[in-house]
Design a protein with these regions (language model features):
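Conserved C-terminal "lid"/linker of ANL adenylate-forming enzymes
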Residues: 250, 276-279, 289-290, 309-360
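Alpha-helix/helix-capping structural signal
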Residues: 14, 40, 88-91, 119-120, ...
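Conserved AMP-binding/adenylate-forming
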Residues: 112-114, 121, 127-141, 145-239, ...
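Short acidic/polar active-site loop segments enriched in Thr and Asp
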Residues: 30-33, 51, 81, 112, ...
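AMP-binding/adenylate-forming catalytic core of the ANL superfamily
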Residues: 73-76, 83, 196, 202, ...
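Adenylate-forming
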Residues: 57-60, 78-128, 139-147, 209-210
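Conserved AMP-binding A3 loop
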Residues: 1-18, 52
Length: 360
């Protein structure tokens, strides 16, 4: 339910076995590994892979409650070699890293792989987390409940992936086929630089949904493939880039605009800690609105000051109708990491229509 209403996804034993093999093969996981999973469902991969796994002392329904000390206790307790955490969990670990003991830091030095997923992971956050695990490879897999993993990318590969529009999630796994269904077009293609919905096929892709027959029909076109609802493109090196959700594409008079690449540009500005780019107005003539959370956020939402507006507009390089500052950006309940752009779009539309500017 991180990108919409919760829904049951059906898997066969064969598909779960294929998922186990895909994860183990991609990350070289053996029976000598030990997993700390700061996201409760991911802890189930431990028994599936035949390795010990624990969940740190945290509120599993609120990943952002994970502290560095709690993670350190878990890693030290089982001698973990693998760590998985959502971006929100990692961010709080970095924020509270001053509470780590020397024993925690020694235990962190034995971790060989740190994985973070559930939403786009900012490179600066991954770098900060990697410094806590000096011997570990930091990587972020891309996928969804219906097919995980689809692709994977390491931190050095992220650093090398510049100049694209969106988040580079790496090359698809060997067992995964990826195609792009062009926006406003038909069919699907693996040609580079075509923007559209990402569709995938893999031995570990879902069988279907639980009693959601229309959803299953829509998500199974073409037959044998899963339509992810994500928008992106493949580059000339075969790497997959994700630009946002299909329902969050902004349909301007100049053509469709995907939000993630623009959000990254805004988040690169000094004093900006988070950003969301949404569309307001009828499809085909939608206007771009940018919502910013600063490093020193206001107590109440407001229109941004002229200086910040100018900096945001220069970074976005598209016409921007308004720039708002907020205290917090609404996020999903599952990972605490995915910005609720639909909610922000409705909030921004009401504010621009003369409504009271309250916190979203």
């Amino acid at each position: 339910g991180a990108t919409g209403p919760s829904k049951g996804v059906r898997y066969t034993h064969r598909q779960l076995a294929a998922q186990r093999d895909a994860i183990a093969g991609q990350y070289g996981i053996t029976e000598s590994d030990r997993l700390v999973a700061a996201f409760a469902p991911f802890a189930l991969y431990g028994p599936l892979l035949g390795i010990p796994s624990v969940v740190p002392d945290m509120d599993v329904a609120a990943p952002a409650t994970l502290t560095a000390r709690a993670l350190g206790d878990a890693v030290e307790r089982i001698g973990a070699t693998l760590v998985f955490a959502s971006p929100a969990a990692l961010a709080n670990v970095v924020e509270t890293a001053g509470d780590l003991t020397p024993a925690h830091r020694r235990a962190f030095a034995d971790v060989r792989l740190v994985l973070s997923a559930g939403a786009p992971v900012r490179p600066d956050l991954l770098h900060a987390a990697a410094r806590l695990f000096p011997e570990a490879t930091a990587a972020t897999p891309y996928g969804m409940t219906e097919c995980l993993p689809v692709a994977s990318i390491t931190l050095p590969e992220i650093d090398a992936a510049v100049g694209g529009d969106g988040v580079c999630v790496g090359e698809p796994l060997p067992s995964v086929d990826v195609r792009i269904r062009p926006l406003g077009g038909s069919g699907s293609t693996a040609e580079p630089d075509v923007v559209g919905e990402i569709v995938v096929r893999a031995p570990h892709a879902r069988l279907g949904y639980d009693r959601l027959w229309y959803t299953e029909h829509r998500a199974s076109q073409p037959a044998g493939w899963h339509a992810t609802g994500d928008v992106g493109h493949l580059d000339t090196n075969g790497r997959l880039w994700v630009g946002g959700r299909l329902g969050h594409v902004i349909e301007t008079a100049d053509g469709p605009v995907t939000p993630v690449g623009l959000e990254q540009r805004v988040e690169s500005l000094i004093g900006v800690d988070g950003a969301a780019v949404v569309g307001v107005g009828p499809p085909g003539v939608q206007q771009i609105v940018v919502v910013v959370r600063g490093t020193a956020p206001p107590r109440r939402a407001r229109l941004a000051g002229l200086q910040l507006q100018d900096r945001v507009r220069a970074a976005v390089a598209h016409p921007v109708a308004a720039v708002f500052e907020v205290a917090t950006l609404p996020v999903d309940r599952r990972h605490n990491s995915k910005v609720d752009r639909a909610r922000l779009a409705a909030w921004a539309a009401a504010a621009l229509d003369g409504g009271r500017i309250a916190n979203p």
